[in-house]
Amino acid sequence: MADPKGSTSKEGFGDWCILEADCSDIENDMEQLFERDTDSDISDLIDDCDLEQGNSLELFHQQECKQSEEQLQKLKRKCLSPKAVAQLSPRLQSISLSPQQKSKRRLFAEQDSGVELTLNNEAEDVTTEVEVPAIDSRPDDEGGSGDVDIHYLSLLRSSNKKATLMAKFKAAFGVGFNELTRQFKSHKTCCNHWVVSVYAVHDDLFESSKQLLQQHCDYLWVRGIDAMSLYLLCFKAGKNRGTVHKLMTSMLNVHEQQILSEPPKLRNTAAALFWYKGCMGSGVFSYGPYPDWIAQQTILGHNNAEASTFDFSQMVQWAFDNQLVDEGDIAYRYARLAPEDANAVAWLAHNSQAKFVRECAAMVRFYKKGQMRDMSMSEWIYTKIHEVEGEGHWSDIVKFLRYQEVNFIMFLAAFKDFLHSKPKKNCILIHGPPNSGKSSFAMSLIRVLKGRVLSFVNSKSQFWLQPLSECKIALIDDVTDPCWLYMDNYLRNGLDGHYVSLDCKYKAPMQTKFPPLLLTSNINVHEEANYRYLHSRIKGFAFPNPFPMKSDDTPQFELTDQSWKSFFERLWTQLELSDQEDEGENGESQRAFQCSAGSANEHL
């Protein structure tokens, strides 16, 4: 018979089990026991402090929550297991509208063989679910905005919103946004014409914008395809990009990121045809007449042939009539005339704009110089004072001369000989201390008669006297000792009123007379013995008193163009200036100077 399993009876192991302990006298010694206890390495083994109950309620609450969570997981596993849904249709796992990623948080805690695994260490078993975007199921009449929400989501998901909008624009209209517009880098640059594309606009706001924008625009072009809306806005006043965006966002209730805005291409025929042909199709709303830049490039008419040819004589005539001789002024102002003048448009389209501007300025100077030489001093003064607008009073000049202790009768006699360029009397000197009004008085006279000012600082150049050949009256302001010495050495004949040889740039020396020359200086040349040969050639008047000013720092005597105009009109006879009616043909008005070819449609 086999041995029974397990241990044997008590008799079997009585040999090795010690039934009684040995007694020792050493352990019975109490003193040694206490000493051994104090030498122990374990301190505070027994806690003798008072006991506290602790937060047992919180522990109980945690245990209850853990138990409830376990019961809830079991209930979900039993009733709502996703594996049961996948078993009904296994092909659902392969259907997905967008790439899916494994969920980082598990909804169901699975158990295997009755042992619950932790959520962090368990391998996930996730089923692929079909995602369908939530669309507002409300009908349109109840304010449903499901389609607009889809457009917003597609825009928000894109990393480059501008590129996304441009791609959608090209897909909708069949043409790139940059093909219709030119780029403005700055948001502060103003322009009257703007191309605006807005994405995902509500239909009601889109329709209302067609009426609201009419009060801001002279021309309006609107079209909407799918989610894209395109506007061509020709505003009544220039606006920058920030102002346009502010207007559109407030009117259409959209964000600024949904807007593309640039000015249109004004000189591109293909772009102009896009807007022109768009008006002929259905679905486009337009308001107002075509802008000029569209009409000129798309509509054929009798003006096209004329606009394509540039007439240089018309440009010269325009500059002559507007008294323009500077190249910069001619170029800028003629370019601004382009919207109104077909010849200016043709000039802008020409490749030789700078060449025409230089030649135009040169021709105007030639005509002005010839016109000046053809006029007498009386006719010149009459012409210039009638170009002055407004009225003044001649007494301001007379009062100022009397304030400076100048005998007005003597000044009037000297001024008469000065204007008529009598020999040895065509040079007047005004001298006195600083701040006495010498330069103000002389400059006001030169300004109204369109004279020239010479500066001795240019005396190192042999052409510094060239302006004397291009004016009727001249001024050298603030003459000092070096200038007096130069005049004493080289300008005696010129001050006498005789012919001199004047060297001009790019020309041979020419024979001419000095015009009436006005001088201002702090030096009384008549008291200087070194310049005794100039005493008989110069008539001097002293201004000893400081120039008077009002309490508001304005001049007490108004030496303006209007004052000189009234002065010449009042003293025309005393200055022995010729009557302009006698110089004309029986008082009849003479025809203005014309340097352009006459037109066939010109009035007789």
From Swiss-Prot:
PROSITE patterns: SF3_HELICASE_1 (PS51206)
SUPFAM superfamilies membership: Origin of replication-binding domain, RBD-like, P-loop containing nucleoside triphosphate hydrolases
UniProt crosslink position (Glycyl lysine isopeptide (Lys-Gly) (interchain with G-Cter in SUMO)): K513
Reaction catalysed by this enzyme: Couples ATP hydrolysis with the unwinding of duplex DNA by translocating in the 3'-5' direction; ATP + H2O = ADP + phosphate + H(+)
InterPro entries listed in its UniProt record: Helicase_SF3_DNA-vir, P-loop_NTPase, PPV_DNA_helicase_E1_C, PPV_DNA_helicase_E1_N, PPV_E1_DBD, PPV_E1_DBD_sf, Rep_E1_papillomaV, Znf_lg_T-Ag_D1_dom_sf
Compositional bias segments (type: Polar residues): 587-604
Alphabetized UniProt keyword annotations: ATP-binding, DNA replication, DNA-binding, Early protein, Helicase, Host nucleus, Hydrolase, Isomerase, Isopeptide bond, Nucleotide-binding, Phosphoprotein, Ubl conjugation
Pfam families: PPV_E1_C (PF00519), PPV_E1_DBD (PF20450), PPV_E1_N (PF00524)
Chain span(s) of sequence motif Nuclear export signal: 88-97
Post-translational events: Phosphorylated.
Chain spans, region DNA-binding region: 144-307
Record PTM Phosphoserine, positions in chain: S81, S89
Record note on quaternary structure: Can form hexamers. Interacts with E2 protein; this interaction increases E1 DNA binding specificity. Interacts with host DNA polymerase subunit POLA2. Interacts with host single stranded DNA-binding protein RPA1. Interacts with host TOP1; this interaction stimulates the enzymatic activity of TOP1.
Protein name: Replication protein E1
Annotated organism of origin: Human papillomavirus 36
Lineage start: Viruses, Monodnaviria, Shotokuvirae, Cossaviricota, Papovaviricetes
Gene that this polypeptide is encoded by: E1
